[in-house]
Amino acid sequence: MVITRRSLLTASAGGLAVMGLSRNMAWAAELPKLKKKDVYKVGFAQTESNNPWRLAQTQSMKDEAAKRGWQLVYTDAAGSAAKEVSDVRSMIAQRVDVILLAPREEKPLVPAVMEAKNAGIPLFCIDRSVDATLAKPGRDYVAFIGSDFVKEGQMCGVLFAKAVGNKAKIIQLEGTTGSSPANDRAKGFKDAIKDFPDMQIIASQSGDFARDKGRQVFEALYQAHPEATALYSHNDEMSMGAIAAMEAAGKTPGKDLLIASIDGTKDAAQAVADGKIAVLVECNPHFGPKAFQAIVDYADGKEIPTWVVNTDRTFTKDNIQGYMPEAF
């Protein structure tokens, strides 16, 4: 199964060298094996910890490690792809048994994936994938564990079209440039609204999945496009920043501009209940149980799908109350 879910040009050997991969480096031909053990030393390379989604994901990992009595080597790249590559290299030097990597971006983390393979350490990509034209699941790393970001975008688009009556001038707040969720959520949403000519994305820019930057970017885009009637945001943090900007400008979220968002944080769920967000698509951050079970299954010799899919739900004001206790 193809992980990145979008067409990409095959990189040349020269392109790999530019990315920091040596043309002469001999990669291991097969995936590293994992011995069956009662206790594993697991490396978890987190991309950042600046939002509720990442904090919930990290806590899920820590809780599952504690539950199983395993050692978790945790690093936080603080939003830096270069640091995340360094973090993985440190884990390789520490000889962890297995690595769980949440890649900051698709291309820059490929060297880390390949170096783990060459060092004989199995690696799983979680939440985000790497560029499958350069490193493939089932060949270069065990599997991708995460949501279908294209489908998330599609679900947002389908429900949002219904909410706006198939007519809207949309500002899009994109996630981190070059990341798989940003790429795929944009594609899914665009695919979902292509049959509605009166639904148009009139402005689009990255807010880097951050609340403050999302607010700043939305303010600038809305000032440039006051005719906008809707906002599609790739995550809840940017949505909440945009809501603050709307309210500061004297606008009413949910009336002056309808909003579609992705993640499922407590703030966003409350905003749905309050009528400020029209459509909310879940992106489940609780990876611990599924990721750690995949490690056990791999050690047991079971066949691991190249894509272990997290299932996500959709929410509107009609059904949000049942989700509120689960929101993170």
Sequence positions of predicted segments:
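N-terminal secretory signal peptides and thylakoid transit peptides that target proteins
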Residues: 1-16
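A residue-level marker of the well-folded mature domains of exported/periplasmic proteins
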Residues: 8-10, 20, 26-328
